[in-house]
A protein has these predicted regions:
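Short pre-active-site segment immediately N-terminal to redox-active cysteine/selenocysteine motifs
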Residues: 61, 68-72, 115
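Thiol-based oxidoreductase modules, predominantly thioredoxin-like and allied folds used
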Residues: 48, 68, 80-106
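Cys/His-enriched microdomains
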Residues: 11, 31, 71
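A short beta-strand-turn-helix
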Residues: 45-64
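Short linker/helix segments within small regulatory modules
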Residues: 22-31
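Thiol/disulfide oxidoreductase modules built on the thioredoxin-like
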Residues: 107-116
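Cys/His-rich microdomains that often coordinate metals
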Residues: 20, 40, 80
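Short cysteine-rich clusters marking metal-coordination/redox-active sites
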Residues: 13-16, 33-36
Length: 117
């Protein structure tokens, strides 16, 4: 692999799921999707389902932190503001995603999630 190729990172678009090749030195500059122009590494928490979870996580080299949650879960709701704060703090360095375990049982099962919390 050439030095130029090694300096690029693949980032999945949270909007259209397209894989984007971004210069690693420019990750903090707010890169946008080449297909739909959506921000790739903003501070938002991305909500994914069974289908989009696999596509998103397989198309990105950026670390992804996943919150498997459920709307009826009190501790999950209590943690949500802290998860969002962490996403803002680490914007550009990691992607934070939420997966509703009730609506995405396949994604939850792949990671051994059997109960919430």
């Amino acid at each position: 692999m050439s030095a130029a190729a090694a300096s690029h990172v693949h980032v999945a678009c949270p909007n259209c799921l397209a894989q984007n090749r971004v210069d690693g030195a420019r990750l903090a500059e707010g890169p946008k999707c080449g297909r739909c122009d959506a921000p790739l590494l903003d501070a938002s928490v991305v909500e994914l389902d069974d289908e989009s979870f696999g596509a998103f996580t397989q198309r990105t080299d950026v670390p992804v932190l996943v919150d498997f949650w459920a709307p009826w879960c009190g501790p999950c709701r209590s943690m949500a503001p802290e998860f969002e704060a962490a996403a803002r703090h680490l914007a550009g360095r990691a992607r934070f995603v939420k997966v509703n375990a009730d609506l995405a049982p396949d994604a939850a099962a792949r990671f051994g999630i059997r109960s919430i919390p």
